[in-house]
């Protein structure tokens, strides 16, 4: 196993709802990261080819055409687009973790929020489907299964991934920790609105004025860092938090046809942006950098600019903390707790 792992986290926007162009961009980023000696290249949640932000900002009855386009621009796990990404991993000699909106072979409208970890020979090491789409995501994606709750054993270490809100699921995280995970990838969208900035008029029934802005909107930066750091501390592993970037083409697609375009635009502009960053096995920030004019430049995180963030990880640093809290070893009571995980792939029908 290599003593030092260099990870490249792509804080990048897709060509929104364009699978072919997004795939081409992903391949270019893989090659760029490989040229900077990365061993593992990571992409955000459903990088190919969009995250359905519109479902949080517009009523479902306004979004039929967007769902149709999302289906058209989603890809098969064994389709041409993912095959091209696999070839880029093979030709560049790197591992790739990439999120994508996955088409189902069983239905012409069923989608999954999925992620592949691809090996240096272009082989698929892990194919994970998000267990439960979160909140408004249920309008786009179907629930996955436990098949992808696996840690990839590679020449660069033991690497696992969970998608967005799955990093809130203690049992899913424990399942990864129990496979001796050394590097945990968490992937996130650029924004995740839980309310618009529009106020709701007084109720006709009780006369109480309620505002949808009451309480804080969802803060991707704080919420993601909290969950990612907690996992690193509990697992004594390194963390890669890779978030999407919202391009202008996404703004145009989300606002187009909205019944309240001003509200949608204002909310999109005001929402906190997610960040891409690295964590060490204590949950603390890990020093990271970008390349500017072929020179390293220290950078704690990426949030407001597209780029590739790099960090070097000494995987032996995962060992010391296990003396204190090995929650799948000496700090666990296996005589009390018993967790079983079904990792079978679930199909809608079995033909005999």
Predicted regions and their residues:
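A conserved C-terminal secondary-structure "cap"
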Residues: 312-352
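N-terminal glycine-/serine-/threonine-rich phosphate-binding loop
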Residues: 1-40
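A short, polar/charged loop-to-alpha-helix boundary motif
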Residues: 130-144, 295-322
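Short beta-strand segments at enzyme active-site cores
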Residues: 39-45, 96-100, 240-242
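Generic short beta-strand
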Residues: 115-116, 122, 272, 276
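Metal-dependent catalytic neighborhoods of phosphoester/phosphodiester hydrolases
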Residues: 47-64, 70, 107-108
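CN hydrolase (nitrilase-like) catalytic-core segments centered on the catalytic cysteine
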Residues: 76-97, 167-309
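Beta-strand-turn-beta hairpins that frame and shape the catalytic cleft
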Residues: 1-7, 151-160, 182-183
């Amino acid at each position: 196993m290599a003593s030092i792992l260099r990870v490249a986290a792509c804080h990048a926007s897709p060509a929104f709802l364009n699978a072919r162009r997004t795939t081409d961009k992903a391949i270019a980023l893989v090659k760029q990261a490989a040229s900077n000696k990365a061993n593992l290249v990571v992409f955000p949640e459903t990088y190919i080819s969009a995250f359905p932000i519109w479902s949080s900002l517009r009523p479902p009855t306004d979004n039929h055409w967007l769902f149709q386009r999302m289906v058209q621009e989603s890809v098969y796990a064994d389709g041409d687009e993912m095959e091209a990404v696999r070839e880029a991993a093979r030709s560049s000699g790197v591992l790739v973790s990439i999120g994508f909106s996955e088409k189902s072979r069983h239905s012409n409208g069923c989608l999954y929020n999925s992620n592949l970890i691809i090996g240096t020979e272009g082989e698929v090491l892990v194919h994970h489907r998000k267990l439960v789409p979160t909140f408004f995501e249920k309008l786009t994606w179907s629930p996955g299964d436990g098949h992808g709750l696996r840690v990839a054993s590679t020449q660069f270490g033991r690497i696992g991934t969970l998608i967005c809100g799955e990093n809130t699921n203690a049992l899913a995280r424990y399942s990864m920790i129990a496979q001796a995970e050394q590097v945990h990838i968490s992937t996130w969208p650029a924004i995740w609105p839980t309310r618009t900035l529009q106020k709701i008029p007084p109720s006709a029934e009780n006369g109480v004025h309620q505002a949808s802005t009451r309480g804080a909107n969802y803060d991707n930066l704080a919420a993601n860092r909290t969950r990612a750091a907690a996992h690193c501390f509990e697992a004594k592993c390194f963390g890669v938090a890779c978030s999407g970037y919202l391009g202008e083409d996404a703004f145009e697609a989300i606002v187009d046809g909205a019944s309240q375009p001003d509200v949608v635009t204002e909310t999109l502009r005001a929402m906190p942006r997610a960040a891409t960053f690295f964590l060490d096995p204590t949950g603390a920030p890990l020093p990271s950098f970008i390349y500017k004019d072929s020179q390293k430049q220290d950078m704690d995180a990426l949030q407001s600019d597209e780029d590739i963030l790099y960090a070097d990880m000494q995987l032996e640093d995962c060992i010391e903390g296990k003396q204190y809290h090995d929650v799948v070893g000496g700090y666990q009571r296996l005589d009390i707790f018993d967790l079983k995980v079904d990792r079978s792939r679930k199909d809608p029908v079995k033909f005999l």
